[in-house]
């Protein structure tokens, strides 16, 4: 074992020790950013970058499960990404489909697809649905795969569902408007039956949410990591957890 590996192991153990008895986020959202820039920095194609990034996911989920995280939401494809050049988008969709299938085949985690699959090619949407259906119905760690996902789009879809439900009950728009509460919208979000994310991590150094879970993250803690997603290490994750543990969550109080 090299000296670097020894030092890395020592540092990882110190980080783990610093989390002993400290709060661990129940739900972690992750914006998997930087695949293309990572690839460009070492002379790889964008497709190669996406494949390496997809390969990181299983490893990351193992880290999350190890520390007791219950839910992970992975943002793999935004609605904005759908406007990319057709050849890159086709390759990216295929990589995502293969990655989700591989996650399902491990039999370790319950998978849920969150996003508007109507925006995707039918073969990709069908593959994603099948992978989710074939994953375990229950697991210690549940994984949300956000594909064709945008926070504004999610809220619009939730409002539409609220209006449809009201119409089916014979309510007028005026009656709906007079009694509408934020909880009515929240329960129609893709993750309406899950707790909101406690911690949102974004890799690549970008310090914005770009629409990720904008309703659910109202009281989330944010951690922005300079590392591109393919290079994201266990110590980077543990640092994010340490930063979370050191913060005082006031929840608006």
Where are these predicted regions, by residue range?
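Flexible, compositionally biased loop and terminal segments
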Residues: 1-253
């Amino acid at each position: 074992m090299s000296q670097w590996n020894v030092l890395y192991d020592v540092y990882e153990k110190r980080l783990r020790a610093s989390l002993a008895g400290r709060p661990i986020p129940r739900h972690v959202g992750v914006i998997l950013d930087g695949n293309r820039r990572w690839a460009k920095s070492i002379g790889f194609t964008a497709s190669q970058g996406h494949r390496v990034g997809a390969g990181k996911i299983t490893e990351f989920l193992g880290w999350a499960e190890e520390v007791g995280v219950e839910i992970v939401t992975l943002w793999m494809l935004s609605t904005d990404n759908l406007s990319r050049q057709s050849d890159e988008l086709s390759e990216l969709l295929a990589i995502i489909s293969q990655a989700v299938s591989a996650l399902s085949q491990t039999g370790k985690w319950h998978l849920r697809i969150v996003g508007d699959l109507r925006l995707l090619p039918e073969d990709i949407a069908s593959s994603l649905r099948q992978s989710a259906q074939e994953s375990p119905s229950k697991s210690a760690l549940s994984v949300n795969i956000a594909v064709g996902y945008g926070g504004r789009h999610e809220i619009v879809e939730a409002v539409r569902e609220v209006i449809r439900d009201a119409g089916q009950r014979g309510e007028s728009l005026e009656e709906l408007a007079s009694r509408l509460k934020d909880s009515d919208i929240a329960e129609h979000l893709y993750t309406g039956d899950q707790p909101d994310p406690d911690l949102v991590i974004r890799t690549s150094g970008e310090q914005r949410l770009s629409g990720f879970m904008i309703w659910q993250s109202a009281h989330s803690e944010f951690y922005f990591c300079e590392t591109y997603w393919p290079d994201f290490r266990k110590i980077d994750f543990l640092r994010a957890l340490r930063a979370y543990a050191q913060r005082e969550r006031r929840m608006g109080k």
